[in-house]
Amino acid sequence: MAFNKLESSNNQEIISEEVGILKELLDDATRGIAGEQGLTTIQHLVELYDEGDYEALTQAISEMTNDDMVVASRYFSLLPLLINISEDVDLAYEVNRKNNIDESYLGKLSETFDVVAESDNARDILENVNVVPVLTAHPTQVQRKTMLELTNHIHELLRKHRDVKDGLINKDKWYADLRRYVEIMMKTDIIREKKLKVKNEITNVMEYYNSSLIKAITKLSHEFKRLAVEKGIELDNPTPITMGMWIGGDRDGNPFVTAETLKLSATLQSEVILNYYIEKVDNLYRSFSLSSRLTEVSETVAEMAKLSPDTSVYRENEPYRRAFSYIQSKLIQTLLFFKAGNFSNERAAKRLSENVRLGSVSTGEVVADFVHDRLSQSLQAVSQQTTEFYETAEAFHDDLLAIKNSLLENDDSVLISGDFEELLQAVEVFGFYLATIDMRQDSSVHEACVAELLKSANIVDNYSELTEVEKVAVLLKELQEDPRTLSSTNVSKSETLEKELAIFRTARLLKDYLGEEVIKQHIISHTESVSDMFELAILLKEVGLVDTERARVQIVPLFETIEDLENSNEIMKQYLGYDIVKRWIKNSNNYQEIMLGYSDSNKDGGYLSSGWTLYKAQNELTKIGEERGIKITFFHGRGGTVGRGGGPSYDAITSQPFGTIKDRIRLTEQGEVIGNKYGNKDAAYYNLEMLVSATLDRMVTRQITDPDELVDFREIMDSIVQDSNGIYRDLVFGNEHFYDYFFEASPIKEVSSLNIGSRPAARKTITDISGLRAIPWVFSWSQNRIMLPGWYGVGSAFNHYIEAEEGNLEKLQHMFETWPFFRSLLSNVDMVLSKSDMNIAFHYAQLAESEEVRSVFNIILDEWQLTKNVILAIEKHDDFLEESPSLKASLGFRLPYFNVLNYIQIELIKRLRNNNLTDDEISLIHITINGIATGLRNSG
């Protein structure tokens, strides 16, 4: 399928003009704070960088006072952010323009449908495809919610820029509004002073649903159905996009995630979507003023109208309005019920109705202000009489369908489009739960809990000391033969066990009240054996989520390290062979999900080793499923950076091994990537459209690499990757000075103290590299601009292969031209090298205390230069990013500013380590971290 890359169509002239305006406004704001001299100092730093006089730049920064640093840090942090906003606006403009004139672009859904429609099983593909972006709270999103809101205001103003140029909007007012928001931004705290709590993370993510995701997903789902109808393909209930959520359920290494946060996450999600429904129904109430004198309604709608709390004489002949009033009042009661969250008490709903009637609970406490301020008389009547609540989203959907059918039966079908159709679509996608919440915990915690349960029940005293075979035998016996719950004994339980059981009990209640979709998976971090999966089954059995026939929560192994990925084949062969597992999977529509860890496998073995091991594991696991009639689906635990599996989403999906995407795919969206992709409804629509198009494309596109050649390619990769793994591990785990280099020549300590998430930077005290979480590991290498996880070990391994035999370079060039996986693999290295800067990295190296530690940089520099030469040779390019001119231009805009910020950060770290910064001034380092992450756009 051939697409024009949308990025290459960006209007660089418009962006340059907007950046010029924004820079002018930022200069004015800076002048107001620091005076003309302060602005001159900042401009001088940029001039020195542009001239390449890095020593003079370093000297000039070293002479700045801490007060000067405050202004400079803010300036160089905010300008890349403003450039980002301009580029995002231009991207949205291009998407809309190309859609309106029916011009192709990368990931355009209508063109993907053209290809899918030619497939023999087009209907099955379109009916079953399901892409699930899973939003996580991984600590790489460093902006405050306030800054995100200011960003959105400026985004909206820049969207109007072209209208200003065309004279459709008053230029002076537009400019004044833009000035005001830039001024506010310059005087607003960029970073958080306090560490986030899980509740904050949940509410922050909910803002993306309110501002963009609900609208974008509803629009995309509707467009998906429309295109199917256009192609003459009848679909029942397709769900091309649904959302997932880790926040509130991911307790791996995060002690702050509890049963309460799980419940809070689910109830807040319900509140968000119910408020959306209430607003939509209120719009319909206002617009459906059809009179019974002029149109007829069905008996069902007439009955709803009779039950309406809206008894105004002025609306007695407006049955649709009264029906919508009835629906709206039920939605409010449902919202009251979920807000109370007392799911364990069957009388909760009745009490809530009583409380509302007696005035002890106001609708204003739960209904969004923008809705409550314009509630009709029918809603005010809710506080005066008891109204039913919706027990299920299906019941709500049925009421809407009754109105739709009434309109169809009475020749009013034209009224179905617009808000009504959007509402129906939203209910089908979001239900009352909005997004499926994943639970996740480390396998070692499960083992400790099960060992405690078995001991307290006098079954096994030393479970953890058993062999794997013995463990599986004990666990299977309990799962298949013993109906009792092990936790029912009177033996006191440890805090960990109590906490875990409380979470599982809450999950059971949430599923009972919100539906099966609210929690569908439990992921096991560090899965290393079959017993790891059966241990989770034991805990789920304790609360009735697993029995001998059915697992209401699917057990999902997460294979993370290189070794675990290599062993995943044998582990899953054994697991899928047990009869009880076969029954669980049969009752899950023959799906078994497996999560793949990109971050830890990369930290463990380097970029090439991680990418290739993941590729092979997917092939092998898919084959195992096919042999057993099971659809293996993959959950890709990708981060924002190449070092954590990131890179362009479209290329990442379309380069997956052929045949490994059946119809479902899940992938994590983490940290700053969430804001970049889903910060506004245009960006959200485009990025979701690309995910669906890429998935469909990979499902229908036949193998384009010659099968015989692919055998040779795999043999070549096996040898190169083995070499690369050794080179990487020799440095990271074999060099005696590497640990000190990382901690002294990067801002890892400062990153770990930054208030960017509720989760600690490590699962335990850090004594070596293996104990560090992958996210701060990658984040820190991004900050010092080495980007080591995204390329180290690549150059030497390829070079060894090239030098081994004449013609090997040509083989690699052929692989790059004909094998999508290999092309994507190397293109990502190209991109990450383009964002690295060895001049800056050299100055970070000088932060190391000894010459022996500093010498590690020379090893890294040699490998960087070799990698650059080899990658460009294989690509047949003269420079980085030759196939991504817009990204190259974008970096050209921003590099001078956030590169200067790196030099400022280095000086601040020096002052901190010499105890020359006050507590307030230490936050300046955090501001520079924010600015560099903003400039890079994918840092963790």
Swiss-Prot record:
Catalytic residue list: 138, 603
Recorded GO CC terms: cytosol
GO biological-process terms attached to the record: carbon fixation; oxaloacetate metabolic process; tricarboxylic acid cycle
GO MF annotation terms: magnesium ion binding; phosphoenolpyruvate carboxylase activity
Presence of keyword Magnesium: yes
EC number annotated for this UniProt entry: 4.1.1.31
Leader sequence residues: none
Enzyme class name: lyase
Cofactor: Mg(2+)
Keywords per UniProt: Carbon dioxide fixation, Lyase, Magnesium
Catalytic reaction equation(s): oxaloacetate + phosphate = phosphoenolpyruvate + hydrogencarbonate
UniProt family annotation: Belongs to the PEPCase type 1 family.
Xref: NCBIfam families: PRK00009.1
Protein role: Forms oxaloacetate, a four-carbon dicarboxylic acid source for the tricarboxylic acid cycle.
Protein name: Phosphoenolpyruvate carboxylase
